Swiss-Prot record:
Key word Transmembrane helix present: no
UniProt-recorded name of the protein: Peptide tarsal-less 1A
Signal peptide: none
Main location class: cytoplasm
Subunit structure: Interacts with Ubr3.
Lineage: Eukaryota, Metazoa, Ecdysozoa, Arthropoda, Hexapoda
Organism: Drosophila melanogaster (Fruit fly)
Length: 11
């Protein structure tokens, strides 16, 4: 959810 501000790959 926060992949757009924190590109950690946790979809």
């Amino acid at each position: 959810m926060a992949a757009y501000l924190d590109p950690t790959g946790q979809y």
